Amino acid sequence: MFLNKFWPNNTFKQILIIYIPWRLALFLALFFAVNFIPLAGKNFLGGGIGNYTANPYLFAWANFDGEHYLSIAQFGYKDLEQAFFPIYPAIIHLLSFPWQHSFISVTLIGLLISNISFFLALYFLFKLLRFDYSVRISYLVLLIILAFPTAFYFASVYNEALFFLLAILTFYFARKKRWFWVGIFGMVAAATRVFGIILFLALLIEAWQGRVKIGSYFWILLIPLGLIAYMIYQWVSVADPLAFYHLQTIVGPQHESGIILLPQVYFRYIKILLTSGLSNPIYSIMVLEFVVGLSFFILPIIGFLKKVRLSYLAFALIGFLLPSVQGSFSSAPRYVLILFPSFLVLGIIVDGLPKLFKIGYFIMSGILLIFFSMLFFRGYWVA
């Protein structure tokens, strides 16, 4: 009885109807990638070249950053891994405790966490959007997220899905005025990714606009504690509370330690795209980065004109700008996945298009999703 009240069957089924085909499509992409696309090389493969070669259908989901999360989950932090926040690998570690010596088991636990988190995120995002928007718009936003060219990261051994869930739960309980849970989920989110600190600013705006009682702000103040706790750990372990930031120039050498103005970043990309040939193997990635970098700056601005909630827009705009001012959009196609307000604005725009254009959008986005997921599965850098 309680579960029926908390989890309406119709909503569950509606999301399941779109989630299962999405997972099947990604598995088919993996199948064709393994059989028809050569490996990019021997590095950055999930589990290392030996494990990947023996079981590519499992370890392809743990390429690039996935290797680090699995290593932290099994062995704790090693040199140069402080850029990866602790909550996701900690949960993998706890749930895989009886089987930690099995790399396959740890990987399966990581995938289970990501996929369950993403499904729950879709469910609560639908409920969150229904506070202000129709069923049609809410459902359309979910479809747009699922079809996004880098949405495969939600199903991989990455912390995107977990953070996405935590961020949505934070906003959801803010709209329900359950501020204790806002503080708890926001605090955990801030220890999951550095983007969690943006929730603090966004929720202050939400509380101010809602004219909540002064005592509710106490719970919002819990949010930064997640990041502060990780900074204290880094201070004790490596004598650098900002190691997660300083290591960005090592794990992502395309990033710079200073602040680069956004127009400079756009100019760099325009110059690269005009001077690089179409035969360049990373040209398609550069185009994706530039389009995402431009779109996700414009979408919050359009959202303001569409009267989207200010707290949502703050989360979307600051969440885009925070990594972009390091001088590159190199990981932007993945970073923007958690910026649900931008997808909301995109959903509003797509909803206003003629039917033929809507179909065209989803066909194009779906093709790009399959294309980039296949590249990722075979060890090519995507985001």
Could you describe each region identified by the protein language model?
Residues F304-V325, Y335:
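Transmembrane alpha-helix segments characteristic
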Residues A25-G41, A60-W61, F200-Q209, K213-L299, ...:
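Membrane-lumen/periplasm interface segments of specific transmembrane helices
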Residues I113-S117, D132-A174, W181, V188-L199, ...:
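Multi-pass, polyprenyl lipid-linked donor-dependent membrane glycosyltransferases
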Residues I104-I109, L125-A147, V308-A314:
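Transmembrane-helix signature of polytopic, membrane-embedded enzymes
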Residues Q82, P86, A90, Q100-L120, ...:
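Loop-to-helix entry region of an early transmembrane alpha helix in multi-pass inner-membrane enzymes
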Residues A60-H101, V265-R268:
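Short hydrophobic/aromatic helix or loop-helix immediately within or flanking a transmembrane segment
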Residues I220-P224, G352-W381:
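Signature aromatic-anchored transmembrane alpha helix within multi-pass, membrane-resident enzymes
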Residues I109-D132, S295-I302:
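Transmembrane-helix motifs of polytopic, lipid-linked glycan transferases
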